[in-house]
């Protein structure tokens, strides 16, 4: 689906247009948007304090943004937590498909985690990550967020060129919806708006670069990424995590 940058107040016009130029998107004033058809599009709504993504701009549309303060308290992924067992004290991690940063936060919440590098190639999504980190001011959240560093770059390109070592590399190539269950708004937005990641060679490269393991998130019925069989899998009702040990 198509994404536009929008703004509500005339005083925000210049900042919104500058962002649209940076993102390579069209900028629209909210008052000029056709209310009958705007649910067919997504809007990056510029606000100086917290920007967001919305599908449509009507009253039923809801803000989508990086809410680390809420996620640190109300979101847990016990399956992903199980995938981190056995990693060394002060392990370092790279999230090759950062998205909104929710899974990276779960990794950072592990007491043994020292740092997480979030790699995100979409410029608008990288901007939301930056804002989410800047707005996380609660001490209970900062102890996790302070482990973050972020880069706006293609993950394959970064892994090919970096000299840094990572104990854990995490990959979540967004899989399409399966079955009748409705995806959460943030997940659906990623499916609709992010370009499909060219994963050819990414997993193989990650296995060579990681010092301990690579974790790949898949739908429970999906084939193995790059047809590479994992050492083992951690399975749930909807998703599974394939674990590849580095040699």
What are these regions (language model features)?
Residues 1-92, 101, 119-168:
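S-adenosyl-L-methionine
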Residues 90, 165-169, 211:
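Local beta-strand N-terminus motif with an aromatic residue
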Residues 96:
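Conserved beta-strand/loop positions that form the S-adenosyl-L-methionine
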Residues 100-113:
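Conserved SAM-binding loop of SAM-dependent methyltransferases across substrates and taxa
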Residues 113-119:
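Short beta-strand element of Class I
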Residues 173-202:
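Mobile active-site "lid"/loop adjacent to the S-adenosyl-L-methionine
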Residues 199-245:
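Conserved Class I SAM-dependent methyltransferase catalytic core
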């Amino acid at each position: 689906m198509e994404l536009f940058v929008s703004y509500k107040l005339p005083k925000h016009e210049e900042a919104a247009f500058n962002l649209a130029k940076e993102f390579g998107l069209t900028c629209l004033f909210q008052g000029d948007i056709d209310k009958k058809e705007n649910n067919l599009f997504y809007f990056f709504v510029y606000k100086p304090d917290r920007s967001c993504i919305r599908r449509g701009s009507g009253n039923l549309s809801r803000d989508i943004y990086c809410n680390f303060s809420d996620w640190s308290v109300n979101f847990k992924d016990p399956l992903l937590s199980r995938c981190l067992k056995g990693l060394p004290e002060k392990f370092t991690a790279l999230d090759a498909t950062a998205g909104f940063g929710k899974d990276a936060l779960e990794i950072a919440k592990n007491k043994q985690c020292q740092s997480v590098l979030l790699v995100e190639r979409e410029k608008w999504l990288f901007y939301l990550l930056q804002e989410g980190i800047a707005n996380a001011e609660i001490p209970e959240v900062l102890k996790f967020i302070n482990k973050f560093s972020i880069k706006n770059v293609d993950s394959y390109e970064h892994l090919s060129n970096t000299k840094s070592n990572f104990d854990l590399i995490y990959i979540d190539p967004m899989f399409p919806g399966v079955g009748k269950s409705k995806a959460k708004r943030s997940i659906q937005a990623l499916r609709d708006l992010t370009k499909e990641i060219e994963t050819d060679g990414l997993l193989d490269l990650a296995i060579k670069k990681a010092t301990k393991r690579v974790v790949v998130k898949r739908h429970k019925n999906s084939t193995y990424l790059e047809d590479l069989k994992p050492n083992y899998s951690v399975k749930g009702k909807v998703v599974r995590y394939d674990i590849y040990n580095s040699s």
